[in-house]
Swiss-Prot record:
The protein's enzyme class: hydrolase
Residues the entry annotates as binding Mg(2+) 2: 105, 107, 120, 123
Active site location: 23
Keyword annotations from UniProtKB, A to Z: Hydrolase, Magnesium, Metal-binding
Catalytic activity: a ribonucleoside 5'-triphosphate + H2O = a ribonucleoside 5'-diphosphate + phosphate + H(+); a ribonucleoside 5'-diphosphate + H2O = a ribonucleoside 5'-phosphate + phosphate + H(+)
Protein name: Nucleoside triphosphate/diphosphate phosphatase
Family: Belongs to the Ntdp family.
Cofactor(s) demanded: Mg(2+)
SUPFAM superfamilies, per the entry: FomD-like
Gene3D superfamilies: FomD-like
Entry's Gene Ontology molecular function annotations: magnesium ion binding; nucleoside diphosphate phosphatase activity; ribonucleoside triphosphate phosphatase activity
UniProt cross-references to HAMAP family, sorted A to Z: Ntdp (MF_01568)
Sites where the protein binds Mg(2+) 1: 87, 103, 107
Length: 176
């Protein structure tokens, strides 16, 4: 159903493998939109959890989604540099309402010096069993975790120097 237009404000919805809604980011401004890649930005946007609790993001963030990668990347601009939060997830879909993806629990937190921690491995194992992830999905997710780590080491895509700053400058044009 097409792609969001640059400058448009949309929501981001994450789901779990069982189809249940996990989290909604209320407002993200689209900065780039093609069939392969969507880049968006938000700042102090409301996030709604599956249980109805809400919270507001603390800093500007650049969100990177790719149609052929089983991960998405959020670059957060903080005083000490860019921090990244990476979700191992399905490739994105856009249905005219929101960017949507399945969150597969494994996350990678990347610090400004490009060191990283892999998070939520226990949660992944629990959900893999309780939601019966097929072996094919398990293999794909592990493969793309390695691809993501390679991108981090190579400073590729959203990890490239100046990537987040460049897109943040573009985002500021929409907020004036």
């Amino acid at each position: 159903m097409g792609y969001p237009k640059e400058g448009e404000t949309i929501q981001i919805h994450s789901y779990k493998h069982n189809g249940l809604l996990h989290r909604i980011w209320n407002e993200t401004t689209i900065l780039k939109s093609t069939e392969l890649c969507i880049i968006g930005a938000n700042d102090r946007t409301m996030v709604t959890e599956s249980d109805g609790r809400t919270w507001v993001t603390r800093e500007p963030a650049i969100c990177y989604f790719h149609a052929r990668q089983w991960f998405n990347v959020i670059g957060m601009l903080r005083d000490d540099g860019v921090h990244y939060y990476c979700n191992i997830s399905s490739p994105f879909a856009y249905d005219g309402e929101a960017i949507k993806y399945i969150d597969y629990d494994l996350d990678v937190k990347v610090f400004p010096d490009m060191t990283y921690n892999i998070l939520d491995e226990d949660e992944y194992d629990d959900h893999r069993k309780s939601m019966n992830y097929p072996k094919e999905i398990d293999s794909i997710l592990k493969e793309y975790l390695n691809t993501l780590l390679h991108w981090i080491h190579q400073r590729k895509g959203p990890f490239a120097p100046e990537f987040v700053d460049m897109w943040y400058e573009r985002y500021l044009r929409y907020t004036k």
